Amino acid sequence: MEKVRLTAWVRGHVQGVGFRWWTRARALELGLTGAATNLDDGRVEVVAEGDRTACERLLELLRSGQTPGRVDSVVERWTNHRGSFTGFEER
């Protein structure tokens, strides 16, 4: 399996609604490590590392319409796996 890093910036009503907690739970179910962080501009930045297929599934879930709050858009960037996380944090 190819290991990758997914960075996704999620825009919408995603702060103060349990979005980071929900993202962490989905990421851990998929065996991913990383973090979900509130940004000052109202977005949430999701960084996930692990198997490409698991990261792709997390991205699908972020765009599914089944998240807490309301997701208006998700911008993604794929880079090399760095191995810099243990577990998945809410920041």
From Swiss-Prot:
Transmembrane segments: none annotated. One of its GO terms (molecular function) is acylphosphatase activity. The active site is at residues 20, 38. Disulfide bonds: none annotated. This is Acylphosphatase. It comes from Thermobifida fusca (strain YX). Keywords: Hydrolase. The lineage of its organism: Bacteria, Bacillati, Actinomycetota, Actinomycetes, Streptosporangiales. Residues 5-91 form the Acylphosphatase-like domain.
